[in-house]
Amino acid sequence: MPTNGLHQVLKIQFGLVNDADRYLTAESFGFKVNASAASLKRKQIWVLEPDPGQGTAVLFRSSHLGRYLSAEEDGRVACEMDQPGRDCRFLVLPQPDGRWVLQSEPHGRFFGGIEDRLSCFATAISPAELWTVHLAIHPQAHLLSVSRRRYVHLCLQEDEMAADGDMPWGVDALVTLIFQSRRYCLKSYDSRYLRSDGRLVWEPEAHACYTLEFKAGKLAFKDCDGRYLAPVGPAGTLKAGRNTRPSKDELFDLEQSHPQVVLVAANRRYISVRQGINVSANQDEELGHETFLMQIDQETKKCTFYSSTGGYWTLVTHGGIQATATQVSANTMFEIEWHGRRVALKASNGRFVCMKKNGQLAAISDFVGEDELFTLKLINRPLLVLRGLDGFVCHRRGSNQLDTNRSTYDVFHLSFRDGAYQIRGRGGGFWYTGSHGSVCSDGDLAEDFLFEFRERGRLAIRALSGKYLRGGASGLLRADADLPVGEALWEY
């Protein structure tokens, strides 16, 4: 049976880009390394590990090989050691422009070069020894202050971001990391950027860009003056403090942002737990009690719904649905059936969830009719970043079409209407399907797309034609897939 996974810290994976805009690559053949790749794929992903000896050095492990980067005394570099040795220890020296310098700890030389001419033999730092850190994780997450154990969220009333939330509940807890001029910005759900003085601004100006630093698997954000973001004062306002070295106060975890949804029943009222433990369709507005965290089990593809009151929906006696379970079990798992703009939910007793005359939900139906259909709306992705098997979705230069194999990503705006979503891109143009299934991004009118949450962290997008959007060898986004699998699934 699946285990609870409400708070999953993301493993920080990244690529290293040299001055020639090429990624450090670990090859399977001969365990050689080069800097020839133009984009961030499987062979270009690295994981930072702390030195087992508790020193200041770190280890670079290839994500796909599981082997460690090493530098010998004569400067030769490879990625062949499956257990870290002395030559695998590097010091990371952050530079003022946000880039890293990697120095061999035992030999004191600097690592760099171009294409297949990489070495760790330089005695001085030149542009060839400078590396840009490019995160390989999905850039939308929750940010948890390590010292306060509180989540960062946007406080509209105070016009600030603060680390004061017990739970990352609602859309205001979503943070999007924006890669900008070799640094990262923190973008709130309303598209503003956090400046180091705590103010929120509409443009990614210099004081809203941060260098990433890693310490014991945690993240720190250094501003252009060399100070670090931290929660400040009783309210936990996020701004740059006085410290020029990261302590526990300046460290953060990135946690996976699971989809949070609201559901509307046939009576056009929101499903809620506001009036007690019974899950009922009896509210006219969507607030915390009407929001549910939805998790999909990777094995069964069934889902759970977790409420703001701290309980999972669970099947109880006589088919009732209550938000009282504290652990995931068979009775908390629901199978989703996709019916165009609506969904049906089948409980563990094999029956469909329906709305009774008093508004309460119960799994007592053998067939799907009007009372068994619900509108499901994703509320915590007003900004949408999509990543497929080959990379991120991004506007194609000089074209109205969309690439699906990029290392960088575009942030799209999402709106919702009657069970369907509308996607708006750069310049305010809407997505629409053109000839032969091509997806274009300069529409004057919004076209409806259906979202189907098929796997944990992945969705399928269905066009009006009934076909699913997919990537592929051409690198173009097309609406021509028959099934929501493989290239037609998107991390969001």
From Swiss-Prot:
It comes from the Eukaryota. InterPro entries: Actin-crosslinking, Fascin, Fascin-like_dom, Fascin_metazoans. Changing R109H: In prebycusis phenotype. Signal peptide: none annotated. It is found in: Cytoplasm, Cytoskeleton; Cell projection, Stereocilium. GO terms for molecular function: actin binding; actin filament binding; protein-macromolecule adaptor activity. It is linked to Defects in Fscn2 lead to hair-cell degeneration in the inner ear and are a key contributor to the early-onset, age-related hearing loss (prebycusis) phenotype when in combination with waltzer cadherin 23 mutant. This is Fascin-2. The gene is Fscn2.
